[in-house]
Amino acid sequence: MKKMLDLLSAEVAKAFAEAGYDEKYARVSLSNRPDLCEYQCNGAMAAAKEYHKAPIMIANAVVEAMQGSEVFGEVQAVNPGFINMKVNNEYLSQYLNGMEKDERMGCEKAEDPKTIMIDYGGPNVAKPLHVGHLRSAIIGESVKRIARFAGHKVIGDVHLGDWGLQMGLIITELRERKPELVYFDEAYEGEYPAEAPFTISELEEIYPTASGKSKQDEAYKEAAMQATYELQHGRRGYQALLKHILNVSVTDLKRNYANLKVDFDLWKGESDAQPYIPDMVQKMKDGGYAYVSDNALVVDVKEDTDTKEVPPCMLLKSDGASLYTTTDLATIVERMKLYNPDEIIYVVDKRQEMHFIQVFRCARKCGLVTDKTELKFLGFGTMNGKDGKPFKTRDGGVMRLEYLLKDINEEMLKKIQESRPMEEKEAEETAKIVGLSAVKYGDLSNQASKDYIFDVERFTSSEGNTGPYILYTIVRIKSILRKYEESGKKAGEGKIGAGRSDSEKALQLELSKFNSVMETAFEECAPHKICAYIYDLANAFNKFYHETKILATDDMEAQSSWISLLLLTRRVLETCIDMLGFEAPEKM
């Protein structure tokens, strides 16, 4: 189904051609003065230069050619040469009925689907998820859902931090505490126990303890580095411990991500890419790309057009150890070999931009990807507290993600219980659903690259540009539809009719933008565009609702039409919030 703006542009193009002007000037856009018109075309202004005529003369001629159009209800030429338009009410309602019949509500599916990998999440194993992991998870999940809706094959990868010194630190601390464990006996050749020698709680306490010790005790740090080296060079007992660390951590991470309604297709980590490093580095040397500088192995990635310095991409340190860049490049090699993606999107902190400029350029220069492979950096800003500084606990620590969600749910539960009587269990379930909308919408309504203030009071409000307000609107629609059916009528039997009031038409106009918004959100990796859209749509619905006696009217034809309009509004809103990663309860 074509987008409304494309249909209107095609109609205006016919008029430009009939008036003797090039159709390329006929592009229609949404009006920037909705008080005057719904759509506008500024093409006469540009055409004036080519045809050496006053813009208003061209606009008048085009408007003349548009008389009698069934697409437009009103058309006006306005000085100095704007063409203002209002769409025909009947034409608009026909468009919405077409949307209603289509299971995708007018959204085209990709003709040539791509394989897209999204690298998001990125938690370190053996550490609890904290608020710093929130944005990557929420934005990545939404971008994944939007791309799937657009018809592409999408693979989400959590890309665990499961390699490097942190593993050596855990092994060293574990050895100090439980030296009798079979994993530390180098002579042992049997099977290792299936059960981990620690719980998630112990693991989360072991790492910070070990990290603290390594900063105070040089010998301890040396032991941890040696353990890391032995792990990375295949020591059996340490490899078995790594498996336990991963299993225990990933089980806990999955539980926490599930509470966020975030899931991944792949639970791979940095360790999975390690086998690809030796061959990759050798090829870079053989190809003449990698060279030794200050005893480190590097690849030059600067370009003549650079406006700031881009340092060489370091592959190996002077001691032969790999770095994040090495692992990220090897991960690209692994992904190309196993999944051959057309596009890889990295949803990471925007402060890592230089790192990824180096990685992407190195990957291209050394032929790790094809000419057609797109590597995208989707950098996000910081989630700040009300003081404008990175969000912390009251005592200045980094807040665990599960505690943040608990705080939000408790605030939401309090508001729900204050607003209406509800059974405790139902109220708690509703608070979880609405609380998640508060967190996700609060984040996603901001452009990803921008910093934002995490304000519990504002995000949990059922008024204003918030998740609970959107859900409140959906619940209101569900309630009206329920009452309509309880009166013995069947919803959806009537067609959506031409708008009978300004507020009804305004709602219909908002609905007609749906496929255009979804397309833009996919192309720009921009969930905030969906948030802005559903806020406008919810406002348009609520204005229509307050001005219209939907259930109290005696006009059955109008009522049937309105109910069909409500069904479409609910479908669009529910599809959009699914793209954002949350759902609506039955009651609030």
Annotate the PLM regions.
Residues 1-93, 110-588:
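Non-catalytic interaction-recognition regions
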Residues 94-99:
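Short, charged, solvent-exposed linker or helix-capping segments at domain edges/interfaces
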Residues 101-110:
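Short, charged beta->alpha transition segments
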